[in-house]
UniProtKB/Swiss-Prot annotation:
Subcellular location, record wording: Cytoplasm
One protein family per Pfam: Cys_Met_Meta_PP
Cofactor(s) required, per the database record: pyridoxal 5'-phosphate
GO terms of biological process kind: methionine biosynthetic process; transsulfuration
Cofactor note: Binds 1 pyridoxal phosphate per subunit.
Protein family: Belongs to the trans-sulfuration enzymes family.
Name of this protein: Cystathionine gamma-synthase
Length: 369
């Protein structure tokens, strides 16, 4: 019987014993694009690096174990991963999508539907299972949720939504970027597919662009593998290695991100310059609204330790302004109606000393008048 290790152990051991010939503890980087054959029909299991690469395979097998899936797939970005999933469907298929969804996902779905006759996105408050069920029609083929959502941090009941998906024979896709398998395993809750922008917490150091898919079911996995090979938007060997290296400390980092975020959420609630704080009490992401839109630029220019940047999940604290960054492609009236106001800031709380983060926020707030 195979030993079932805890997730902390799986992460710490990622890549170890992956190269039996040398016994390398750190997974080697295989840069070769082609692999020799002994004869017709005789292969080492590797032929061409787009199809399969030894370093990428280590990452794909590791993320599959972490998410309790049947197979993992690594792509050149999170958006490339979503594009591959869209390729599984054809018009007039529809996806029910979280109304509070990452702006890049909105942009891809909107453009592909309007210009490429792709799946039609139907935006729903997926925090409400009844709202999801009310939106299901004969063309609905999948439900796509973020939990917590980006950037309003709304949580979805994956178990209840999975029951709905099964009842109506729909695929349930969960973006698990914010929580990672350390804090949530959607496949165990009934989802069919999990995706990650591995650029964020999984790689964790703001130095690798990564997309990941984990799926259950042989037929579905085979279809994804076929498209991955055909489309070719695969992760490079070096970025695969960076991700493997980064994920070794994922469990430790997530605990510190969460600990700091919980403290910062309480701190922000006590600040008179802050109108509201959005935090689901798990993970390292939160959002907050300033009292006055006119303060936003002054605040962003005033932070010194925290970086004003358009990403999340790294060791460093980042603040993002969704209105002009992540969600700028959503028309303003629609964006504001969804709750992504011009006073909203998204905060990826890093692993620095929490008192230093608080001090930076305080000195920035002091400039708001």
């Amino acid at each position: 019987m195979t030993q079932q290790y805890a997730i902390d152990t799986l992460l710490a051991q990622a890549g170890n014993r992956s190269d039996e010939r040398t016994g390398a503890v750190s997974a080697p980087i295989f840069l070769s694009t082609a692999y020799g054959h002994c004869g017709i029909g005789e292969s080492t299991g590797f032929d061409y690096t787009r199809t399969k690469n030894p370093t990428r395979t280590v990452l794909e097998e590791t993320i599959a174990k972490l998410e309790n899936g049947d197979r993992g797939f690594a792509f050149s970005s999170g958006m490339a991963a979503i594009q591959v999933l869209m390729t599984l469907f054809t018009a007039p298929d529809e996806w029910i999508v979280s109304s509070d969804v990452y702006g890049g996902t909105y942009r891809l779905l909107d453009f592909s539907y309007k210009n490429n006759n792709s799946v039609k996105p139907v935006y729903v408050n997926t925090a409400s299972a009844s709202a999801i069920e009310a939106a299901i029609n004969p063309n609905t083929k999948a439900i796509f949720i973020e939990t917590p959502s980006n950037p309003l941090m709304e949580e979805c009941d994956v178990v209840e939504i999975a029951k709905l998906a099964k009842k109506h024979n729909l695929m349930l896709i969960v973006d698990n970027t914010f929580l990672t398998p350390v804090l949530s395993r959607p496949l165990d809750l009934g989802a069919d597919v999990v995706i990650h922008s591995g650029t964020k917490y999984i790689a964790g150091h703001n130095d690798a662009l990564v997309g990941l898919i984990v799926a259950k079911g042989q037929e579905l996995c085979d279809r994804i593998a076929y498209i991955q090979n055909g489309a070719g938007a695969v992760l490079s060997p070096f970025d695969s290695w960076l991700t493997i290296r980064g994920m070794k400390t994922l469990s430790l980092r997530m605990k510190r991100h969460q600990e700091n975020a919980q403290a910062i959420a309480e701190f922000l609630k006590a600040q008179p310059q802050v109108e509201s704080v959005l935090y689901p009490n798990k993970g390292g992401m939160l959002s907050f609204r300033l009292q006055d839109e006119a303060w936003v630029n002054t605040f962003l220019k005033s932070i010194k330790l925290i970086t004003f940047a358009e990403s999340l999940g790294g060791t460093e604290s980042f603040i993002t302004y969704p209105a002009t960054q992540t969600h700028m492609d959503i028309p303003e009236s629609e964006r504001v109606a969804r709750g992504i106001t011009n006073t909203l800031l998204r905060f990826s709380v890093g692993i620095e000393d929490v008192e230093d983060i608080k001090a930076d926020l305080l000195q920035a707030f002091a400039n708001l008048k």
